[in-house]
Structures are given as C-alpha cells and as structure tokens.
A protein has these predicted regions:
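Exposed, interaction-prone extracellular/peripheral surfaces
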Residues: 2-47, 63-68, 77, 86-99, ...
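A positional/architectural concept
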Residues: 52-55
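Structured adenosyl-cofactor binding patch, chiefly the S-adenosyl-L-methionine
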Residues: 125-128
C-alpha cells in the first residue's frame, strides 16, 4: 500500500461523520478477509478463518449477487419479480458480527487527527464491510452516553448502509449536547451492554469499541454472560494527549467530566501524570479482559486507521513520537 492509501478517507474532517467517509472502507474490506490475513492478526490478536459451504437453515431471500451459488436461486421469486433472487442459509459455522460503538462524551475528543468517536466509527465501518464481504450478518448497538440505538444483524448491503447512517446521526446529532453526569453515563453503559446481550444471536463475534471510561465492575457480569456463547473482542481507543503525548507546550483549561483544571503542558510532570493515569486505566481494562479471556486491542485517534493496521507497532507507542 502506498502512503495515500493509508491516509484518512477524503471526506473526513476528524470531528463529524459522513456516509462517504464510512463507505470509503468498503474498498479495503476484501484484503482483510481470512484466511489470507485478518484485522485481528494485525492487531496482535487471532481470528479463526471460517470455511463455509452451503447452509442448512433458511435465513432470507435477496437479489442475486455475483459469487452466489446458482444452486440456491429461488426460481419462484425470480419468476415473480423478473430478477434473479437467491436463498440465504444460516450455517453451523456462521458467525454474525455484533458491534457496540461508543460515541459518548468522553469519546468525542481528539487532540491531533480525529475524535476518538470518529475513529470508532471508521473501525466499525471497516468491520462491517469485511463481515458483509464474508457473507455474514453484521449489526450492533450505538451508545451515545445516555441511550442506545439497536441495529439488528443483516447480510444486506442496504441494511449495513442504514447501520452506518444511524452511527452518523447518533454521533453528529449529539456533538453539541451538554456533557452527561459521570454516574449517569456509567449506568447507561452497563444498560447498553445488557441490551446487546438481548439483541445478540448466539455464536456471534462481539466487538466493543470504546475508550472504556464508563467501564465498571458491574459490566463484568454482563461480559461473562456474553462470553459464554459468543467470542468477545475489546477495542480500546485512546488519544495521544490522554497519554501525555503532545507537542503543545502552553497552558490549557481541561475537563474530564469529573473535574476541571488548568494544565501546564510545558511541564514534564504534567505529561507524566497524564501517562500514569492512562496506564492505570488501561491496566483496569486489561485486567477485566484477562479475567474473562477477552482479547484487548488498542487503536489511537492520532493516526489514520489503515496505517495502524499495517504497522507492527502498538498504536500507543507510535504516538510517543509526538511528545
């Protein structure tokens, strides 16, 4: 891949979202299909490839697409509509992808390139197109800090586009809203995970995309239940400034929704304190993930998504150069 390919989508401004911006990742989906390579292997995880034959349980009928098995053509629907339609089947090895996308207050922050919430949407979009290319279903829940929006899993491109439009609307509509109370947000986060549990088909691959600042011990029991019948992945998104990595040397008034203060970024002790706080938070998330045998992956909002997936270096380490 050349440098241009690894840059941001041409329609991205880093703060708000557009449909063209998310559809951009469709062009990159095929290269990440297992078994040749996978997003998870590039993020120091493992993603088992699935070899799928013709399914056994009928799922739905949709218009024929290139690559569909001609033996599955539904001739009755084809004759009635005048357009070829094919039957889709659920297979024993089918693995729907269910995404939990956090676009809450703490995610709407970025010091260099993107808001964390925008990076979350980019990654969710890439996973959605990869899942669609693998002829699996994708859906999920969009969490804005107070409420959730459900999108049932589907293997139709139209449904995936509607899913992305929902992410955009949920993200952009709440961009200027007042910050929520921390206790309220953590409670809503747990409720959103419970909703995911009700929506999720058994045997799904569940991907939680968040900065996990709303994570509490209450969530552990929910994750434990989800992991009994599904495969979970944590994708933790952070910003370089949260880790003390910044070229800014002035004084800035900042808030984390719990407290506000003036910070002197020319001071090495300020940057060190931020780094220590970030490390403590990451350790908390890592510990919960380890206890539940959930894989934890990291992404930075300070770098384009595709450049991180093609690098062997941890995103948090790539950001260190910004100090």
């Amino acid at each position: 891949m050349n440098k241009t390919t690894l840059s941001l989508p041409p329609h991205s401004n880093g703060v708000t979202l557009s449909l063209n911006e998310l559809v951009h990742y469709k062009n990159h989906s095929l290269q990440w299909l297992p078994p040749s390579q996978s997003v998870w292997s590039k993020m120091n995880g493992s993603h088992q490839s699935r070899q799928k034959g013709r399914g056994m349980d009928f799922s739905e009928v949709r218009q024929y697409q290139p690559g569909d098995d001609i033996r599955s053509i539904d001739w009755r629907v084809t004759a009635r509509t005048g357009k070829p339609h094919t039957k889709l089947y659920n297979e024993e090895r089918e693995q729907p992808t269910m995404l939990f996308i956090d676009v809450s207050d703490t995610m709407r922050f970025g010091s260099q390139l993107l808001f964390k919430s925008v990076q979350a949407a980019h990654f969710a979009s890439l996973l959605s197109w990869i899942t669609l290319a693998a002829k699996d279903r994708v859906g999920g829940i969009i969490f804005d800090g107070l409420s959730t929006l459900d999108c049932k899993p589907s293997s139709r491109q139209k449904s995936v586009l509607q899913f992305m439009q929902s992410i955009i609307e949920q993200h952009n509509t709440n961009s200027d809203s007042e910050p929520l109370d921390t206790a309220q947000q953590t409670s809503s986060f747990a409720k959103g995970l419970s909703q995911l549990q009700r929506l999720c088909p058994k045997g799904s691959e569940i991907v939680i995309i968040s900065d996990f600042y709303a994570l509490t011990d209450e969530c552990k029991a929910i994750f434990s239940q989800l992991s009994k019948h599904n495969r979970l992945q944590f994708v933790m998104i952070s910003d370089p400034l949260e880790q003390g990595s910044t070229r800014f040397n002035g004084t800035e008034y900042v808030s984390d929704n719990k407290r506000s203060a003036w910070l002197d970024f020319s001071s090495s002790s300020t940057k060190k304190a931020l780094e220590q706080q970030a490390n403590l938070h990451k350790a908390y998330v890592q510990n919960m993930a380890m206890q539940l045998s959930i894989q934890l992956h990291c992404l930075s909002s300070g770098l384009p998504l595709l450049s991180q997936l093609t690098s062997s270096q941890d995103p948090s380490q790539q950001d260190k150069g910004a100090k």
